[in-house]
């Protein structure tokens, strides 16, 4: 088996390191960061023997793939440069920061025929994968409504340790709408296989922060899918509150799933059945349904589980490596990456126009041009 050589760009890529190290036939050989001190940390953590301050210089090395974990505004330019250089790409979220970038990214993946995968690791958490399998087996009946929330006060990241303004001040909290949607949307989209979001409408209560940023004090974005299903995503990165990493809800014709929403509350499921009739339904702890956890999660080693997010940080990079080796499309391909990201980008226009409905373009290959434009109802 040929060894796949990986280059890591940016300190955020350290979250993938333990997962990559747990995969046979994978070697992290290169690291890149503009900050020399950060570069030393990355090299030490990864064991990379080659270090670079310039991204294009790393692309001239013999790496096969690159993990792009730089600031958001760098993702698409660096992904396109890597694809053009013949490298496979795994990119941190979000896929891009403008709608034009998303179209350019899709075109580049199609042109250079290399693997591109979005590193939306929340979609790989065990509870999400368990419910996804239960949906596949029909235990929830037909899913028709879902919720996803990402509630994380990030105002401590507005400045770098040296006091300088960070990139997040502009590209995250300097924008309106559900600017960072993939942790909310990506996992629940797995409950609606073969579907995609086609229109959105975003609302906010306004801005109630003392930091002078444009980001709304929480947004709610209603998403309608191609098959008529409804998804409600909530994003709040400025309000004072404990970090609630994620909250998900799924409603189907035969049952419901809901993650814990606070201290002492756990993930739970309620399914219609002989012992759970309409009018008398009760919750069961998700641990009662562990038989539906995918086999690879059941058999995960300590090393794989320790990669983070209950093994999710291992399995997402495993899928990326497998996609490179087989040539098959990865689970979170460029089209999903761009569609999920577009929800956030267009929500900014929607919320600024009193919740105006925005159509999500169809990024899929060979779609007619009229399907790839931003439509205003």
Regions found by a protein language model. Name each.
Residues 63-65, 71-72, 76-124, 138:
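Beta-strand-loop-alpha-helix segment that lines the small-molecule cofactor/substrate pocket
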Residues 12, 122-213, 221-223:
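Predominantly a Rossmann-like dinucleotide-binding segment in NAD(P)-dependent oxidoreductases
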Residues 157, 179-277, 284, 305-306, ...:
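Contiguous beta-strand/loop segments that form the cofactor/metal-binding neighborhood of enzyme cores
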Residues 1-46:
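N-terminal Rossmann-like dinucleotide-binding module
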Residues 48-55:
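Conserved SAM-binding strand-loop segment of SAM-dependent methyltransferases
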Residues 86, 113, 138, 228, ...:
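Glycine-centered short loops/turns at secondary-structure junctions
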